[in-house]
Regions:
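C-terminal capping/lid segments that line or modulate ligand- or cofactor-binding pockets
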Residues: 229, 236-256, 367-368, 376-396, ...
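Ser/Thr-rich low-complexity repeats and stalk/linker segments
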Residues: 578-669
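Acidic/polar, glycine-enriched structural segments that form the non-catalytic walls/loops
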Residues: 2-181, 563, 568-577
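Aromatic-rich carbohydrate-recognition surfaces in CAZymes
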Residues: 109, 177-282, 295-309, 313, ...
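Long, well-ordered core segments of solenoidal/helical folds
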Residues: 142-149, 202-224, 258, 263-285, ...
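Extended ligand-binding clefts on enzyme/binding-domain cores
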Residues: 13-16, 22-32, 39, 125-126, ...
Length: 905
């Protein structure tokens, strides 16, 4: 059956494929069946040790093929697996393959890799044969992780972490779940792979990786998605902003020698750099994809990326952008310590922390680490991310705060194993692992309970040691003139590999754990763990293989080969740049400006070169203007404004001294003609009047309070905008707390539904039958589906914190032209990615991470113990038409809840 489906709607490269298995000696028996059922060949062998009563047909479903090869002692059999878009093609490929001499095919394959290896940089002979072998294997794994259809698309890993615990038969919205996992393209992981290829001498693949990110993955606003499919399109689990992922491709452009490419600069580098300027230094989440705030590793990437952007701009003769980018990078470098070095923490007088939530590293702010871990004061949570400031050339290894922080992490998150030392991703004052991303072990600082159980499906566990952090520490040691310490780390990484030298994501540092007995539920079964050997996440991890290759060559050269010279020249070789005074006198921060342009005025050092840029929420092409400050230091510039809000960045440059200032103004209405504009009362984010927010500090007041809803169209796109009283980053994403569903009724639509997005879970239906539905959140691409659940197309989702707006943008040609009779039904609730459906749970009274049906001691029918919290409508706020009370509409004690939409007049 070629009628296959997947919830990965952008996987256009995947077509129904036939598979044929041929044996040079035929088969004694064979059977086809359904995975996990009695007809599965594996189940038949387990029960009867034979395929004698097998099956010859298994239409539809998840199919398995099992065959018996007739072979005896000292006899070889060749098997060939053929693929094709037709049955005949698959059979032909298999037959032609099995007809070849295997030794000859193997020899050709081996020679191809030998030719590739011959072109690589050679490690020093004194590293020894074992290290040399692992070096070549590491580079080969990175190269092998590149997709063969889309050059430069390097997967984060060729493994599926804990794939044994994820059933192949899972469905999402009625379609088979696409489990891409690490076999997708993440900009940060691609960059790490790029660095390994670059120092190894494979400039061709390094350039291909750069072009893949810009040509295929980059979003219209200039940013990079968290991850993508191999074709660069959005994956089902794409979501959340990470500024290091937006910055690294710019550095890759410079380091791979593409700075002279004019079109690449105009179409890709400028939008990317403008996005980083507008959103840096602290938007989105840090490199572990868990926390928002000011991250040393993220800001290091921003500084390096913007310095590279300035260098590229100079090559292109674009002096205004060069000054803007470099001055912004200078400001980030100037303030990195004030943002992320605490002087009131428990470990030392001064040290870098993992993340500073507000830019004040001395604030007594606590946050939950996630994945079943606890809540800790930000000053007591440390990681090694600050070492990126050294690797990328922003700070010297000898910097006192760096030196003090290295001692802190070595005392706090370093652990010894039978194969050498390693480091946790992060840690606290606890002597146990507080990272919950990994196979469960107890005692630990997390809530997992079954020792050896995998991280999914509960998304809780225990994090272990990451070999990439050993390489990171080793590169610091080299920069610190301590290669004697870096060498043993290279050896430890090699000894911690799996198979023939595959570098894992995590390594087990605890006591050995035996594998669970055969037949144990895979969701809780231990695969068996040995101290100093790989844990159960991913092996290989492409980043880890690249970091091993990089460290081996760095040790060989006695210096860090990949450190970008343009950054070290700017901040180390010639000393930190000076700082100029800069004041923006108008407009006032947060002012409302509804005109197409805004006049920006201010003062700085007389004769300084002032550059100002304005960027809207859609990013893309930004407005830029420049002028030389007058004799009194005053300056005036005009910039375009945009809908929602406009971020204005101003810089001043005079010789090697710079200055930077940034603010925003609230903009005008949506583009085009507004066809629907409805206000909603403030403070009604309590469902039927009793609902309560979770008690965790992660949930900010007003985050579920819809204040306005609007729809506009301009002949090309339709804009659907939902305004919230408060829109702040939560769990590392700007729309990380919310789950927004919008049901669209179009008159005359052939197929409609009145069901909620998740019938039986959301506990409501829709009054106006809908033919299209949108669902938006911060950790996945927006869903745009029809009444049957099929994908309609790709929607762009733009959030804007200053204006508190979340806007869906879709092509009018697909969505339709909105007119009288259309109805929009809005339902806002909480997102929880730890289970499916991704709706946050309700309990009788609020919990740390659950909504409360009522406050403690609440009265009224809905607060009665007889009301099951699982039966109430999961709607914190909606927009009702005139004459409809939200309190009444959402009260489940009055009968089935039916949401009324707002009609287009």
């Amino acid at each position: 059956n070629t009628n296959t489906t997947t919830n990965a709607v952008n996987r256009d490269y995947a077509v129904p494929t036939y598979m044929a298995l041929e044996s040079s000696d035929g088969f004694s028996s064979a059977s086809v069946g359904y995975a996990g059922s009695a007809s599965d060949g594996l189940a038949m062998l387990d029960s009867a040790h034979s395929l004698a009563n097998g099956y010859s047909s298994a239409p539809d479903g998840h199919v398995t093929l099992t065959a018996e090869v007739p072979t005896g002692w000292n006899r070889s059999v060749t098997l060939a697996l053929g693929f094709g878009t037709t049955e005949a093609a698959a059979l032909t490929v298999a037959h032609r393959s099995v007809s070849q001499q295997f030794d000859a095919a193997w020899s050709r394959y081996e020679q191809q890799w030998q030719r590739y290896d011959a072109g690589l940089r050679k490690p020093a002979r004194w590293l020894g044969s074992a290290a040399t072998r692992e070096y070549y294997e590491s580079v080969n794994v990175v190269k092998a992780s590149e997709d063969k259809t889309f050059p430069g698309a390097i997967a984060a890993g060729l493994a599926s972490p804990w794939g044994q615990s994820v059933p192949a038969g899972n469905f999402t919205n009625g379609e088979p779940t696409y489990f891409g996992s690490y076999r997708e393209e993440f900009s940060r992981d691609t960059y790490e792979a790029f660095t390994g290829l670059l120092v190894a001498g494979d400039i061709q693949t390094a350039r291909a990786a750069t072009l893949f990110l810009f040509d295929r993955q980059q979003l219209p606003d200039g940013s990079m998605p968290r991850n993508s499919l191999p074709n660069g399109e959005s994956a089902p689990d794409t979501g959340g902003l990470q500024l290091d992922e937006c910055s690294y491709p710019i550095l890759m452009d410079w380091q791979s020698g593409l700075a002279g490419d004019r079109q690449l600069y105009l179409q890709h580098v400028i939008p990317a750099a403008d996005f980083v300027v507008a959103h840096g230094p602290s938007d989105g989440s840090e490199r572990w994809e868990e926390q928002s705030g000011y991250s040393p590793s993220t800001i290091a990437a921003e500084i390096a990326g913007l310095t590279a952007a300035a260098a590229i701009a100079r090559v292109q003769g674009d002096i205004a952008h060069a000054r803007l980018y470099q001055a912004t990078a200078d400001d980030f470098a100037r303030n990195i310590k004030s943002w992320t070095v605490t002087t009131s923490g428990p470990f030392a007088p001064r040290y870098f922390i993992r993340v500073s939530k507000t830019g004040d590293p001395n604030a007594a702010i606590s946050y939950n680490l996630g994945n079943g871990s606890g809540t800790y004061d930000q000053r007591s949570v440390v990681d090694a991310g600050f070492l990126e400031l050294v690797r990328l050339g922003v700070l010297p290894a000898s910097d006192p705060d760096v030196q003090a922080s290295v001692k802190v992490i070595d005392d706090t998150i370093e652990r010894q194993t039978s194969n050498g030392p390693g480091w946790y991703r992060y840690g606290t004052t606890s002597t146990e692992s507080v990272d919950g991303y990994g196979d469960c072990y107890q005692p630990s600082g997390t809530s997992c309970s079954v020792i050896g159980a995998p991280w999914p499906p509960t998304d809780t566990g225990t994090g272990h040691l990451w070999p990439v952090l050993s390489a990171e520490h080793g590169e610091f040691d080299i920069a610190n003139n301590d290669s004697g310490h870096a060498g043993p780390l290279l050896t430890a990484m090699r000894n911690m590999t799996s198979g023939q030298g595959l570098e894992p994501e995590q390594v087990w540092e605890d006591a050995n754990v035996a594998p669970s007995p055969f037949g144990t539920d895979p969701s809780t079964a231990s695969i068996g763990f040995v101290n100093g050997q790989p844990a159960g996440s991913a092996s290989p991890l492409t980043w880890a293989q690249a970091s091993y290759a990089r460290l081996a060559l760095d040790l060989s050269a006695g210096r860090n080969l990949e450190a970008p010279d343009i950054v070290t020249d700017r901040y180390l070789t010639h000393g930190p740049p000076g700082q100029l005074p800069l004041t923006v006198t108008s407009p006032a921060p947060g002012a409302t400006v509804t005109t197409p342009t805004v006049t920006v005025t201010g003062t700085t050092t007389p004769g300084a070169h002032v550059v100002a840029e304005s960027v809207g929420p859609l990013g893309g092409t930004a407005g830029i203007a420049s002028i030389k400050a007058g004799k009194s230091g005053d300056w005036t510039l005009a910039l375009p404004t945009y809908f929602a809000s406009t971020t204005i960045t101003v810089t001043a440059t005079l010789h090697r001294s710079t200055a930077y200032a940034q603010q925003y103004v609230i903009g005008g209405p949506l583009p085009g003609t507004t066809v629907l504009s409805v206000s909603d009362p403030t403070g009604d984010d309590n469902g039927p009047g009793t609902y309560q927010y979770p008690t965790s500090s992660n949930f900010t007041a007003g985050s579920f309070d819809v204040t306005h809803f609007a729809v506009s169209q301009d002949g090309t796109n339709v804009y659907i905008e939902t305004s919230l009283r408060t829109l702040v980053s939560t769990f590392g994403a700007e729309f990380g707390a919310q789950l927004l569903d919008i049901y669209v009724h179009a008159p005359g639509a052939a197929s409609t539904s009145t069901a909620s997005a998740y019938p039986g879970n959301m506990n409501y239906t829709i009054a106006s039958p809908w033919s299209q539905r949108f669902e938006a959140q911060g950790f996945a691409s927006p869903a745009w589906v029809n009444a049957a659940g099929g994908s309609v197309g790709n929607a762009q989702f733009v959030t804007d914190s200053p204006s508190g707006t979340a806007t869906l943008i879709v092509p009018e040609s697909t969505f339709g032209t909105v007119g009288s009779g259309w109805t929009f039904t809005v339902a806002l609730t909480g997102q929880d990615g730890t289970h499916f459906p991704p709706t946050r749970d309700f309990t009788a009274t609020p919990g740390a991470y659950t909504f409360g049906v009522c406050a403690p001691g609440g009265t009224g029918p809905i607060c009665s113990p007889s009301v099951d919290p699982n039966s109430v409508p999961k709607v914190m706020d909606t927009i009702t038409p005139p004459g409809v009370s939200q309190d009444t509409e959402l009260d489940p004690t009055l009968g089935p809840v039916v949401l009324q939409g707002v009609p287009v007049p």
